[in-house]
C-alpha cells in the first residue's frame, strides 16, 4: 500500500512538473500579439512531437518485453536440461552399485589372464633369447658402419627381450635375485652396445652444425633415436607406477644428455677461439672478440635456418642453443674481465659486451629476427664487474692523459727554441701543433668512450677538462719561464716574438676547441650542469694570453726606452725625432703582431696605445726641463699636440677594423699641452680645474710637476691651486679608465714645488 501511495505521489509530481513545463513553453511561444495567429500551427506541431515520442516509447517497451520473454524461455529450457542430467547421474550410480559384485567374481579370470600374458611373453621372446649372440654381433657391425637407425632397432629388440623377461620374473617372484642376475648376465652385452651407440650419437651432435649442412639425414636419425629412447623411458616410468620394476640402465635420459653434450660443445667452441696472446699480438683481444662474434653469428644463423628442421618443435632447439651460447659467452667475458687488462683492452671488451653483442653485427642481426630479442638478453657482465672495469679504465686513462699532456708540452717547448718561425694557419696566424695534438688525443678517447656508453663519454670529457685545467697551469708557467729566459739574453731564442705570438694564439684555439668539444659530446642540459660544477678555463687562457701580450709589449718598450727618455728634454725641444722612432718601432713590431688573433690583438693594441701615452705623460711629470718663457711653453705645447696627433694616427691605423675609438688616450696629452700652452696665468686655476674634472685620478703631485714644467707659476699661486683642488676632490665617472694613477712623480719634484 505504501509503495502504491509513493508511486501515485511520484506520478502526480511528474504531471505537475509536465504542466509547469508546458505552461512555460506556451508562454515562451506567445510573447507577442502577432504570435496568436500561429496558435493552431503550434498546436499541430506539438501534437506531432507528442505522437512521435509516444511511438518511440511504445517501441522501446515492446523491445524490453520481447527480451524478457526470450530470457524466461531459455531459463525454462535450462531447468529441463538440469532435470535430465540429474536423472542420468542417478541411473549411472545405480548401474555401478549393481556391477561391484560381478567384478569381484571375475578375480580367477584375471589371475589366469596374468599368467597367460607371462607365458605368452616367454614364448614370444624364445626366438630372441636364442639369437642374442647373433643380434649383438649384427648390432656391433651396424654401429661401426654408421647405420645408426638399424643398429638402434636391433638394440631395442635386445632390450625389449631382456626387459620383458626381467619384468615377468619380477612380477612372479620379485625376491628371486638369482634368476634376475642370470637374465641380466645373458644380456650383458646389451648395455655395452647402448653405451657405444651413445658415443656415436654424441660425436654426431658435437659436429651438428657441420653435419646439418653436409648430411642432415644423419642428424635426423640421431634425433629420432633419442626421441625413441625418450618414449621408452616414459613408458617404463609409467609401468613402474604399476609394477615397481625398472630395467637396468633406465631411464637413459638421452635427451638431457644430448643438451649437455651441446652445451659442452658450445663452451669448447667459444674457448677455442683465442689464437693469440698479448705477447704475440697487441691486438689479440680485438681478434679474439671478432672471431667469437663471427662464429656465434654463423652458428646461430645455421641453427635458426637448418638445425631447427632436424629437431621436433618441442625440443625448442634454437632457444636452448641461444641460451647455451649466451651462458658460454658470459663465462668467457667474465674470465677476460678478471685478467689484468690494459686500457685499450678494457675499451675493446666493454664495447663488445655492451654494444657489439646486441648490435646488428651479432644478436641484433636481421637473420636472427624475430627469434632473438636483444632486449630480453641478460647482460654478459654484471653491473659490478662493468663498474670495476670502468674504474680501472678511468684510472689508467687519467695516468695516460697526464703523461700525454706532459709529453706534448715538452715537445712544444722544444719548438720554441727553433731558428725558424712557427707554422701559420689558413688565415696566416702563427700557431704551434700543441692544441691540435691535445684535442686530437681528447677526441680519440671521447670517440672510444662514446662507443661504450653516454655516461662514460661524459666522465671522460669531465676528466679531459679537469686535466686540461692542470695542463694550462703548467703551460702558463712554461710561458713565463720562456719569457724570463729571453730577458736574460734578448738575442735568444731567435724567434721569441713569433713563438710568443703562437702561444697567445694557442689560447684562442684552446678556447674554440673546448667549446667545440662540449658542443659535440655533451647534451645541452649536461653542458649547463657541467659548466656550473667545473671551473671555467677561459680565465686561465685569458691570463696566459694577457701575460703573453704583456711580454711582447715589454719587448717593445725595452726597445723604446731610450727614445722615451728623450721626451721632454732639451734635445727634444731642439727637434728630437724620438716620437718618429717610437711610431716606426711600434708599427714594425705590430707587423709581427698582425699574426695575433683578433681578440687578443685588439686588447694588445689598446694596451700599447695606453702605455705609450702613459710613458709620454710620465716624461712630462719627470720635470726633465722647465720652460723659461711663454714662447718656449707655446713651442713645447704645440710639439706635444703634433706628437699626440702623430700617435693618434698611428694607433688609429693599428686599430682599424676593431670598431673602437682609439683617440681617448691621446686626448690626455692634448689636455696637458693646453695647460702648458696657457698664456694668461690668471686663468691657470680654471684650466687646471678643467683638467682635473676630465681626469679625476690626477694627483696634487702631478699638478705640481705640471706647474713646475710651465716655470712661471709663483709659489703662492701653486699653493692656492693645490689647496683649492684639495677642498673639492672630483668623482670619477663609472666608465672612466684611470691613466695617471700609475705615474709616479719623483719626490724631488714635490720638494722643489713648495720652494
From Swiss-Prot:
Gene3D superfamilies reported for this sequence: 1.10.357.50, Exocyst complex component Sec6, C-terminal domain
Tissues where this protein is expressed: Widely expressed, with highest levels in kidney, followed by brain (at protein level).
GO biological-process terms attached to the record: exocyst localization; exocytosis; protein transport
InterPro entries: EXOC3/Sec6 (IPR010326), EXOC3/Sec6_C (IPR042532)
GO molecular function: SNARE binding
Location of N6-acetyllysine modifications: 38
Compartments in which it is found: Cytoplasm; Cytoplasm, Perinuclear region; Cell projection, Growth cone; Cell projection, Neuron projection
Protein transport recorded as keyword: yes
GO cellular component: exocyst; Golgi apparatus; growth cone; midbody; perinuclear region of cytoplasm; presynaptic membrane
Keywords, alphabetical: Acetylation, Cell projection, Coiled coil, Cytoplasm, Exocytosis, Golgi apparatus, Protein transport, Transport
Source organism, top-level taxon: Eukaryota
One Pfam family it belongs to: Sec6
Coiled-coil zones: 34-62, 618-649
Assembly and oligomerization: The exocyst complex is composed of EXOC1, EXOC2, EXOC3, EXOC4, EXOC5, EXOC6, EXOC7 and EXOC8. Interacts with EXOC3L1. Interacts with BIRC6/bruce. Interacts with MYRIP. Interacts with SLC6A9.
Name this polypeptide is given: Exocyst complex component 3
Protein species of origin: Rattus norvegicus (Rat)
Gene: Exoc3
Amino acid at each position: 500500500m505504501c509503495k502504491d501511495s509513493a508511486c501515485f505521489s511520484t506520478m502526480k509530481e511528474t504531471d505537475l512538473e509536465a504542466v509547469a513545463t508546458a505552461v512555460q513553453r506556451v508562454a515562451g511561444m506567445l510573447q507577442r500579439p502577432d504570435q496568436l495567429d500561429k496558435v493552431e500551427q503550434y498546436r499541430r506541431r506539438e501534437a506531432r512531437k507528442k505522437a512521435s515520442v509516444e511511438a518511440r516509447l511504445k517501441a522501446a517497451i515492446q523491445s524490453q518485453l520481447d527480451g524478457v520473454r526470450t530470457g524466461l524461455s531459455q531459463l525454462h529450457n535450462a531447468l529441463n536440461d538440469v532435470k535430465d542430467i540429474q536423472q542420468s547421474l542417478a541411473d549411472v550410480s545405480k548401474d555401478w552399485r549393481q556391477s561391484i559384485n560381478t567384478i569381484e567374481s571375475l578375480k580367477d579370470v584375471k589371475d589366469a589372464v596374468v599368467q597367460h600374458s607371462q607365458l605368452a611373453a616367454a614364448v614370444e621372446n624364445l626366438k630372441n633369447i636364442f639369437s642374442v649372440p647373433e643380434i649383438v654381433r649384427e648390432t656391433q657391425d651396424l654401429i661401426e658402419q654408421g647405420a645408426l637407425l638399424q643398429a638402434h632397432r636391433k638394440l631395442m629388440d635386445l632390450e625389449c627381450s631382456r626387459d620383458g623377461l626381467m619384468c615377468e620374473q619380477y612380477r612372479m617372484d620379485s625376491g628371486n635375485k638369482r634368476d634376475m642376475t642370470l637374465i641380466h648376465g645373458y644380456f650383458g652385452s646389451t648395455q655395452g652396445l647402448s653405451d657405444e651407440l651413445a658415443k656415436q650419437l654424441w660425436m654426431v651432435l658435437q659436429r651438428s652444425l657441420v653435419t646439418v649442412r653436409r648430411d642432415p639425414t644423419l642428424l635426423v636419425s640421431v634425433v629420432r633415436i633419442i626421441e625413441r629412447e625418450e618414449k621408452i623411458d616414459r613408458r617404463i616410468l609409467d609401468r613402474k607406477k604399476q609394477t615397481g620394476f625398472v630395467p637396468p640402465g633406465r631411464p637413459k635420459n638421452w635427451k638431457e644428455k644430448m643438451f649437455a653434450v651441446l652445451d659442452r660443445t658450445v663452451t669448447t667452441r667459444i674457448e677455442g677461439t683465442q689464437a693469440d696472446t698479448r705477447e704475440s699480438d697487441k691486438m689479440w683481444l680485438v681478434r679474439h672478440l671478432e672471431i667469437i662474434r663471427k662464429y656465434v653469428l654463423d652458428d646461430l644463423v645455421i641453427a635458426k635456418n637448418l638445425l631447427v628442421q632436424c629437431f621436433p618443435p618441442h625440443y625448442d632447439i634454437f632457444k636452448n642453443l641461444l641460451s647455451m651460447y649466451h651462458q658460454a659467452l658470459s663465462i668467457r667475458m667474465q674470465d677476460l674481465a678478471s685478467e689484468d687488462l690494459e686500457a685499450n683492452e678494457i675499451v675493446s671488451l666493454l664495447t663488445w659486451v655492451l654494444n657489439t653483442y646486441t648490435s646488428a653485427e651479432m644478436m641484433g642481426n636481421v637473420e636472427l629476427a624475430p627469434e632473438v630479442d636483444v632486449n630480453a638478453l641478460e647482460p654478459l657482465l654484471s653491473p659490478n664487474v662493468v663498474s670495476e672495469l670502468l674504474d680501472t679504465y678511468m684510472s689508467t686513462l687519467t695516468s695516460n692523459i697526464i703523461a700525454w699532456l706532459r709529453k706534448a708540452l715538452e715537445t712544444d717547448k722544444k719548438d720554441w727554441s727553433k731558428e725558424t718561425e712557427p707554422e701559420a694557419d689558413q688565415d696566416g696566424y702563427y700557431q704551434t701543433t700543441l692544441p691540435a695534438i691535445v684535442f686530437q688525443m681528447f677526441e680519440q678517447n671521447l670517440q672510444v668512450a662514446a662507443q661504450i656508453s653516454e655516461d662514460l663519454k661524459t666522465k671522460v670529457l669531465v676528466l679531459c677538462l679537469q686535466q686540461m685545467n692542470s695542463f694550462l697551469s703548467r703551460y702558463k708557467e712554461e710561458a713565463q719561464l720562456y719569457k724570463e729566459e729571453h730577458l736574460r739574453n734578448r738575442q735568444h731564442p731567435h724567434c721569441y716574438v713569433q713563438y710568443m705570438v703562437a702561444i697567445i694564439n694557442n689560447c684562442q684555439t684552446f678556447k674554440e676547441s673546448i667549446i667545440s668539444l662540449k658542443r659535440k659530446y655533451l647534451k645541452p642540459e649536461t653542458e649547463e650542469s657541467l659548466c656550473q660544477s667545473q671551473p671555467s678555463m677561459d680565465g686561465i687562457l685569458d691570463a696566459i694570453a694577457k701575460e703573453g701580450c704583456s711580454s711582447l709589449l715589454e719587448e717593445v718598450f725595452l726597445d723604446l726606452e731610450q727614445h722615451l727618455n728623450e721626451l721632454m728634454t732639451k734635445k727634444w725641444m731642439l727637434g728630437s725625432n724620438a716620437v718618429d722612432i717610437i711610431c716606426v718601432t711600434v708599427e714594425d713590431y705590430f707587423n709581427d703582431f698582425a699574426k695575433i688573433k683578433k681578440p687578443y690583438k685588439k686588447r694588445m693594441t689598446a694596451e700599447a696605445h695606453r702605455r705609450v701615452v702613459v710613458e709620454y705623460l710620465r716624461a712630462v711629470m719627470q720635470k726633465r726641463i722647465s720652460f723659461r718663457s711663454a714662447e718656449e711653453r707655446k713651442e713645447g705645447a704645440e710639439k706635444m699636440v703634433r706628437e699626440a696627433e702623430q700617435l693618434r694616427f698611428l694607433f688609429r691605423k693599428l686599430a682599424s677594423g676593431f670598431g673602437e675609438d682609439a683617440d681617448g688616450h691621446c686626448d690626455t696629452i692634448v689636455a696637458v699641452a693646453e695647460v702648458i700652452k696657457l698664456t694668461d696665468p690668471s686663468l691657470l686655476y680654471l684650466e687646471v680645474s678643467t683638467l682635473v674634472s676630465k681626469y679625476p685620478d690626477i694627483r696634487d703631485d702631478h699638478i705640481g710637476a705640471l706647474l713646475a714644467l710651465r716655470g712661471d707659476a709663483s709659489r703662492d699661486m701653486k699653493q692656492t691651486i693645490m689647496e683649492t683642488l684639495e677642498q673639492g676632490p672630483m668623482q670619477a665617472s663609472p666608465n672612466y679608465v684611470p691613466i695617471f694613477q700609475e705615474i709616479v712623480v719623483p719626490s724631488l719634484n714635490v720638494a722643489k714645488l713648495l720652494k
